[in-house]
Amino acid sequence: MENLQSSLPGWEIVRCIGSGSSGKVYELKKKDEYGGDFHCALKVISVPGSQKEYDEMLSTMSEFAMRAKLREKVEEISSEYRLLGALRGHPNVVNCEDQMIIPHENDMGWDIYIRMELLQSLPDYVRENGMTVESVIKLGSDMCSALELCRENNIIHRDIKPQNIFVSRYGVFKLGDFGVAKASAIRTSADKVGTYSY
């Protein structure tokens, strides 16, 4: 956490919002020019994801091959940010503001920081508020709007599920987590990705 804080001058880490197989998400805040607090979310992805993954890779390949494999993984993750850049500003897609790739000092690997707007996940929203008929219709309409934008930009999300849908404080539903999304021109329908149960 100290390394994370030192990499984010001007920002204060408020809390860890959640974690999963792809990394952790933190709430950050900083003072805006009017003295108020500005909040955002920071997705932190480490490559490799754990010491165990590092050790397993090192036991099966050369250091040169491992470095190339890890760089390839960093590039894949960075492509999520580039895809979101093409969709930036749309009201129904999570807005990503910034990305940093920071190499580990003492060993092989990188940390990727993706700063984005702070939102509530759909499952958390439903637990706290429930869903009216009107909000279900709005959810459907907002997701159709997000998917139409993806189609216009030749992007296939490939992992739409409640955990990848977010809600703004104004009740706007947004599609996020484009970690397995790809430009459709370079994929085939035979590629199997995403969450199996969805």
Show the residue positions of the predicted features.
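AlphaC helix of the protein kinase catalytic domain
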Residues: 123-132
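Activation segment signature within eukaryotic-like protein kinase domains
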Residues: 139-140
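Conserved short submotifs of the Hanks-type protein kinase catalytic core
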Residues: 107-121
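Structural motif at the C-terminus of the N-lobe alphaC helix and the adjacent alphaC-beta4 loop
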Residues: 82-91
